[in-house]
């Protein structure tokens, strides 16, 4: 018997020996796989890369070794990989080191298959249960190796290393697996009869299980006085019973349920049919097929989700989501606002743990027609100096699905490093217009507005219905001399091009006036826009009124004029991109941002997170999860 001594450093610094076992004829050969990469499992958590290199280095020339670790804690995951220069050395390592203790713990060595389909196919994989506790990986391998080349072999163990009584063996081909099943199923291993059969995933086991053929019966709603003998007497007349037990707690009291196992499945089925609903000691029994815990949990979860969905579908069109509420509005006040449009079954203002209003709430009507009428009449209406946002309430999951569907075709926006002057992109007429450079329609990556996700033209009373074409985007070029070293602009001194956009000259404002922000603004984000005609601050209400008389393109431009300077105060470098993202929100939401510095800062921060994620890759996923409304 060949003995190979592998000397290496133990985790505590002492020297440990790894003693090899004789090579088995059932080991997989290198010529079969032509593989130089090995998987090493069941490693001690203290084994390092260098110690793994020392153990396998005696088998041949090792190219690389790696112990896999948790990304956060850097703790070993208990497995690693070893790469040799030639297949012969890898085959020798499998034959001589498989199941050999490495620093006190037997390791498993097998070929590494990078193609996951090979590992997950289940071909040649068998399941063994009712194993004696003394049978370990090596004993199981030695037992099954005579039927063919074994790819992997494992006995399931708990956290303390004790066998759970079952294991798995995967052969290189299906023929070897079938041969092992035929020869060993029902045989005695260490005086215990074992079951050997094809491996089935849990989903496959559940789907292939014949729920009409069962022998184990579940009984509940038992009286406290019901005993095991009572169950035997009640069920015994339907067939031969192998066991009957009433489940008890630690104090010996009945838990109110039990199990009866029949020898014949037909007898069990007749007992269920006859005794389900039977009264015993004034208790009506429930009798049915005994289920596994996982099966029962799955069934209950499916039933719960179905009931939840049915309830949501029933009230979906009757439940309204209300946003941009004044902090002074209570549940009663919210109900009073919506009551003129129908029967309000419930109204709720959402609050934080301190009782402060979150500015949003829900109103449920008796019928969908009443909810639709309330939404059409109150969307954009000024309540306590704030325009309401009213829409059909959506579940979070449904909203995410809609966002994913909307942005599934959006291509990532590449964030290039800034060179020279900043060139923001937003609709014509934006602040700081220099020489206008038109580039036609916005590219797909600009996230064009779509019905139901962009601005809603009827959120402000009198706003024109229908959506026009996507507005053209342009890049206003800010002159270098107007740029501060820190990326900001000097107050004033911005030269407009001699030829303005005709729409800008004639239709920008109903009274022919432009908006501007006061010079020398500070860090606050709630400075109201100015009407240049009167040099007086333009209130949100007046802005909403002006928006109601403008076309969709003009509305977007007007809001961009007002929003851009506020965004620039919070995020100067990406102000244009962030402004464009915020303008995709509903009109009332943008108006809310204009008067709420805290809300604006939160949305800007959210937009910047998305832009950074897009720059790092995974744009579609980030855009799909973006929720700026």
UniProtKB/Swiss-Prot annotation:
GO cellular component terms, alphabetically, are: cytoplasm; nucleus; plasma membrane; ribonucleoprotein complex
Q: Where are the transmembrane segments?
A: none
Q: Which InterPro entries match?
A: Hud_Sxl_RNA, Nucleotide-bd_a/b_plait_sf, PABP-dom, PABP_1234, PABP_HYD_C, PABP_RRM1, RBD_domain_sf, RRM2_I_PABPs
Any Pfam family from its record, for instance, is MLLE
Annotated region described as Disordered, given as residue ranges:
1-25, 480-507
A single BP term in Gene Ontology: regulation of nuclear-transcribed mRNA catabolic process, deadenylation-dependent decay
Name the predominant localization. cytoplasm
For the RRM domain, which residue ranges apply?
36-114, 124-201, 215-292, 318-395
PROSITE patterns assigned: PABC, RRM
The source's domain of life comes to Eukaryota
Key word Membrane present = no
**Record CDD domains:** RRM1_I_PABPs, RRM2_I_PABPs, RRM3_I_PABPs, RRM4_I_PABPs
Alphabetical UniProt keywords: Cytoplasm, Host-virus interaction, Nonsense-mediated mRNA decay, Nucleus, Repeat, RNA-binding, Translation regulation
Which SMART domains does the entry mention? PolyA, RRM, RRM_1
UniProt biased composition (Polar residues): 1-12
Instruction: Tell me which positions the record assigns to the signal sequence.
Output: none
Loss of this gene results in the following: Pab2 and pab4 double mutants, as well as pab2 and pab8 double mutants show significant growth and development defects and more resistance to Turnip mosaic virus (TuMV).
Any one GO molecular function term: translation initiation factor activity
Q: Does the keyword Nucleus apply?
A: yes
> What does the entry state regarding organ or tissue expression?
Expressed in all organs (at the protein level) but under distinct spatial and temporal regulation within each organ.
Report the locations given in the UniProt record: Cytoplasm; Nucleus
Family of this protein: Belongs to the polyadenylate-binding protein type-1 family.
Protein task: Binds the poly(A) tail of mRNA. Appears to be an important mediator of the multiple roles of the poly(A) tail in mRNA biogenesis, stability and translation. In the cytoplasm, affects both translation and mRNA decay. Stimulates translation by interaction with translation initiation factor eIF4G, a subunit of the cap-binding complex eIF4F, bringing the 5'- and 3'-ends of the mRNA in proximity.
Subunit-structure text: Interacts with eIF-iso4G. Interacts with ERD15/CID1 and CID7. Interacts with Turnip mosaic virus (TuMV) VPg-Pro and RNA-dependent RNA polymerase (RdRp).
Q: What does the record's miscellaneous section state?
A: A.thaliana contains 8 PABP genes.
Protein name listed in UniProt: Polyadenylate-binding protein 2
Q: Could you tell me which species this protein originates from?
A: Arabidopsis thaliana
